[in-house]
Regions:
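Short, well-ordered beta-strand segments in beta-rich or mixed alpha/beta enzyme
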Residues: 2-9, 39-66
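An amphipathic, aromatic/His-enriched active-site/gating alpha helix that lines ligand/cofactor pockets
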Residues: 20, 24-36, 55-81
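Short, surface-exposed ligand-recognition loops at beta-strand->loop->(often short) alpha-helix junctions
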Residues: 9-18
Length: 81
């Protein structure tokens, strides 16, 4: 299994649209054939601190995720947030 932990500090003024876009990406990611798990976690101390826990069958499946339309749309949407 190949696991990625992505730590993000979202800008407070964009938090809700950031979470919406991130949850949409996660919902699509779990349908990928190589995906094992995709969790969107928020800090209880600071809700703008977000951790993405992504588990894939292998490194190739993780790399394939970064080429999907939903991932590319997410990256473009949240780039400045």
């Amino acid at each position: 299994m190949y696991v990625s932990l992505v730590s993000i500090h979202a800008k407070a003024e964009f938090l809700e649209p950031f979470l919406e876009a991130t949850r949409a990406n996660a919902a699509a990611a779990v349908k990928e054939p190589g995906n094992v798990r995709f969790d969107v976690l928020r800090s209880v101390e600071d809700p703008t601190r977000i951790l993405l826990y992504e588990a894939y069958r292998d490194a190739a499946a993780s790399a394939a995720h970064k080429e999907t339309a939903h991932y590319l749309r997410w990256r473009e949407t949240v780039a400045d947030w």
